[in-house]
Structures are given as C-alpha cells and as structure tokens.
Amino acid sequence: MQKEKDVAIVGSGLVGSLLAIFLRKQGHKVTVFDRRPDVRNVQFSGRSINLAMSNRGWKALREAGIEDEIRELALPLDKRAMHVEGQSVYFQKYGEEGEAIYSISRGILNRKMIDLAESAGATFRFEEKIWDVDMKEARLYTGESEKSVWKEYQFDLIFGADGAFSRVRHKMQRQSRFNYSQHFIDVGYKELTILANEDGSHKMDNSSFHIWPRGNFMLIAMPNLDGTFTCTLFMPFDGETSFESIKTEDEADIFFEKYFPDIKDEISNLKKDFFKNPTSAMVTIKCFPWSYFDKITLVGDSAHAIVPFYGQGMNAGFEDISVLNEKMNLYGDDWEKVFEDYQTERKPNADAIAELSYRNFVEMSKKTADPKFLLRKKIEQKFAENHPDLWTPLYSRVTFSDKAYSDALKIGDYQREIMDEVMKIPGIEEKWESSEVEEKIISLIKK
C-alpha cells in the first residue's frame, strides 16, 4: 500500500473509471473530472462502436476485482460470420476451442464502471470542464468557459484519461521536446441498429462477429444482450462510393439494396438513422513522453489513440492501468520511477498495436473475401493446430494472450514472410493439407 495521495483523474470513460478503482485500492483519495454530463443520465448518441473485450481487458478487470460484474454484460463471440457477395454465409473460428472475444456496449459498460468506481470511494465531478493545468504544482482550473471565473483545485498527482483530444496532453505538448503526431484515415463510420425479434431473440447468429466485406468499405454487426445488433458501416468520407455520395434517403435505400440486400430490411429506421446518426472520424495519435516528473501521466487514448479495427483500443487502455498498478506495487511512493517505467514499457507496445490495427482494417475490408487470403489463413490455422509449440497465429497472439504487442508485431512479420514463401508452392490450392506444405513451413521456421 502506498502513502495516501490526493489524485485527480481527468476523464470518466472506461480507462479513467478503471484507474479510479485501482487507485482507491492503493488507498488514494480520487476525484474524477469530466466535461460531459454523467453518462448514466443521458441517452446514447449513436456514435459508439460496440467493444470487443479480450484477454488483456479481462486480466485488468480481474486484478481490479470486478471481472464477474462485467462478464454479466458481455456476449462471447467465438467466430466471424462472413457475408461475402454471391456466397452463402460462412464462418471462421477465432482461435482454439473456448477462445472468444466478448461483445459489450460501450455505454452500458461505462455506466457500470462509474458505479463500481463510486462504490470503491471515488468522487465524480461531471460537467466540469478543465481549462488549464499547472503541471509543476499539479493544479487544475475549471470553469464554464475560457473567459469565465475559474475554480482552482490542488492535487498531488494528475492522470490524463480524457481521450484522443486530451486537455491534459494539450498542456504537455507545450513542453520542449514533446513529440506528437495525429493521422486521420479517410474512412469514417456510422452506427445503425438491427432490432430483436418479437420474442427478444437475435435475428442472426449471436455468437459471431458479422462482417460484410465490400472492398473499400464494409459493414460489421455485433450482438447485444437485449437481442439487438449494433451495426457499424465503415466507408470513405469522399469518392464514388462514400458517405458524401449518399445525399438522400432514396440513395441510402439503393446503396443498401445493392451491397447489403440480406440485411437491409432488418436495419431499424435505416433511412432515418443513416442521416440522423453522425458520421464519425477515426484517428491514430502518438506522443511522448507520457509523463511529467512525479506529477502527471497520460493513460489510454490520451497517450495513444488507435483505429478500432483490431478491437484493442479499450484492451490496450486497460492494459495501461494493469501495468501502472504493477509499477505502483513495485516502486511504492517513488512516483517518478512509477511513471518513467510505465511509459518506457508501454510506448513501444502502443505503437505496435496502432500499426496492427491499421493493417487489420485493410485485411477486414479488402482481403477477407479473397480466396488466396482465405487459403493462407486455413493453412496457418491447420499448422497451428498441429504444431502449437511452433506457431501461434498473429490474431491469437494479440487477442488471446497478454504477451507484448511489440513482440506480436515482430513475430507476425516473420510469419508473414514464411507464408509468402508457402503460397508460392506450385499447386498450393490442391496440396495445402499435404505433408509437403507442413514440412516446408517447419523448414522455414528452423532456418
């Protein structure tokens, strides 16, 4: 147990709420600030992709002692359901028997996490906007507007958990030698909903992550506990087939009839929601350093926002908190050492999952309908089943383990080189299950 500190967390999202629980367990006084209203009292905005909880997230929740409460909110998905044009729906298992990702609503999870943090003794101050941060003195200044009278709060430590456009990080960026970059992809997303059947059951398989790959764009759907599915359309902002090109309800109707005829009539209020729900942007943010001496550090998206295509944004943020807690246990009251070790360990892993997430976007939208790519995955899966000591697929290494993201990226690149060679074998389409292919992979691994 550390000596009690008066701690501020800026941001009451998932990562901020989890951090509040860990800090309370360490015996600290915790105040959480958020410029937004209490999410428990507002309707959801139609701007949130469903979350995929995997091993890293569950590990952090287990360490916080709240895993069981959160599992009650989640649905296990053990496979992808691929809705490829001109083909029957087919399924791709994610990993070994019993391995699954878990679909969970961001809004429902956030409400629960705030409840749990409050139960642990954290104080939440909603609709209180941070306008300035005195980094040397660990002071926060809040107010109605930039020109209104500000209120001053004094703390021992401040954690920035306020997302991709963090106010805390914005202040840190004014330091000399603070590195920062942001990159928006030219693809946006829009959320839609498939309602439950009248008896409350799901209209599609509810143990699958559904994907409609269409080249430059795609639709995904994840089930919710209430029988609904949250659908997310990912598509370029501009161009021939884009959000910008669909201007009327009739054009939206024609678009869905052409590309998603099997699901079009199931999407609730399709034409209305397409224009009512916002089209949101996606950004990758990198920065360093994440901490300022023994006073301030960044966690989650405020340190490393990523695109959502590996389902690892929340998991990476939760892993930040797990590692931070590990450093608190290791170094006790030496907060400068806690922060330094935390950022040194997490930075290369954050960069790695950012890269992997972007690559997975290309894979999900463009490659999952490609027969060569699917054959490659089948060969890899079969070899992994026969030789688990020699091969763990990249997806499993990221999703079903808690080994470093940076190692997953490195090993994944090595495996890709091997599979490139394997796919050059003459007649690979006919002999993919043969001992020749298996022996070729083993020989390449042992090179």
UniProtKB/Swiss-Prot annotation:
Q: Which cofactor does it need?
A: FAD
Q: Which domain of life is it from?
A: Bacteria
Q: What class of enzyme is it?
A: oxidoreductase
Q: Does the keyword Zinc-finger apply?
A: no
An example GO BP is: quinolinate biosynthetic process
Pathway where it operates: Cofactor biosynthesis; NAD(+) biosynthesis; quinolinate from L-kynurenine: step 1/3
GO MF annotation, one: FAD binding
- Family matches, as Pfam families: FAD_binding_3 (PF01494)
What task does this protein carry out?
Catalyzes the hydroxylation of L-kynurenine (L-Kyn) to form 3-hydroxy-L-kynurenine (L-3OHKyn). Required for synthesis of quinolinic acid.
Lineage, please? Bacteria, Pseudomonadati, Bacteroidota, Flavobacteriia, Flavobacteriales
Which key words are in the record? FAD, Flavoprotein, Monooxygenase, NADP, Oxidoreductase, Pyridine nucleotide biosynthesis
Q: Which SUPFAM superfamilies match?
A: FAD/NAD(P)-binding domain (SSF51905)
Species of provenance: Christiangramia forsetii (strain DSM 17595 / CGMCC 1.15422 / KT0803) (Gramella forsetii)
Q: What reactions does this protein catalyze?
A: L-kynurenine + NADPH + O2 + H(+) = 3-hydroxy-L-kynurenine + NADP(+) + H2O
Can you tell me which family this protein belongs to?
A: Belongs to the aromatic-ring hydroxylase family. KMO subfamily.
Protein name per its UniProtKB record: Kynurenine 3-monooxygenase
Per the UniProt entry, the Enzyme Commission number(s) are 1.14.13.9
